[in-house]
Amino acid sequence: MGFQKFSPFLALSILVLLQAGSLHAAPFRSALESSPADPATLSEDEARLLLAALVQDYVQMKASELEQEQEREGSRIIAQKRACDTATCVTHRLAGLLSRSGGVVKNNFVPTNVGSKAFGRRRRDLQA
């Protein structure tokens, strides 16, 4: 008995599904009315060309802005040395500091009796 009540519903649902499958949504505009700039109507090659043109225009715009900025700054650009933290660079910086300070550093230090001449003179003085 349940099958008799179920069969009209099954037949009706099959007909509805068949009709729904055969219906297709119509486009809002025809292909002739659509603009060529619409991304849905562009082919893959056209989209690549459009993207390349946009990128090229952007790069040219940024390059011209950079040139204008450099012209405005002009002589304000100052060359700076790289920072270096190796032992050689630190030694050079300390040597420069000592040479710039001049006699101030020499007065603060007690002279030592070291060097190539100091040891040689002692030996000669002892032998003589």
Curated annotation (Swiss-Prot):
Query: Where in the cell is the protein located?
Result: Secreted
Q: Which Pfam families match?
A: Calc_CGRP_IAPP (PF00214)
Disulfide bridges in this chain = 84-89
Where Phenylalanine amide occurs, residue numbers? 119
Q: Which SMART domains match?
A: CALCITONIN
GO MF annotation list: hormone activity; protein-containing complex binding; signaling receptor binding
Gene3D superfamilies, A to Z:
6.10.250.2190
Task: Give the signal peptide, or none.
Answer: 1-25
- Cellular component terms (Gene Ontology): cytoplasm; extracellular region; extracellular space
**What tissues contain this protein?**
Expressed in spinal cord.
Question: Which keywords label this protein?
Answer: Amidation, Cleavage on pair of basic residues, Disulfide bond, Hormone, Secreted, Signal
**Pro-segment residues?**
26-80, 125-128
- What is the top-level taxon of the source organism? Eukaryota
Give the matching InterPro entries: Calcitonin-like (IPR021117), Calcitonin/adrenomedullin (IPR021116), Calcitonin_CS (IPR018360), Calcitonin_gene-rel_peptide (IPR015476), Calcitonin_peptide-like (IPR001693)
The miscellaneous comment for this protein is: The CALCA gene (HGNC:1437) encodes a small family of peptides including calcitonin (UniProtKB:P01258), its C-terminal flanking peptide katacalcin (UniProtKB:P01258) and the calcitonin gene-related peptide 1/CGRP1 (UniProtKB:P06881).
Task: Report the protein's function.
Answer: CGRP1/CALCA is a peptide hormone that induces vasodilation mediated by the CALCRL-RAMP1 receptor complex. Dilates a variety of vessels including the coronary, cerebral and systemic vasculature. Its abundance in the CNS also points toward a neurotransmitter or neuromodulator role. It also elevates platelet cAMP. CGRP1 can also bind and activate CALCR-RAMP1 (AMYR1) receptor complex.
- Family assignment from sequence similarity: Belongs to the calcitonin family.
Protein name as catalogued? Calcitonin gene-related peptide 1
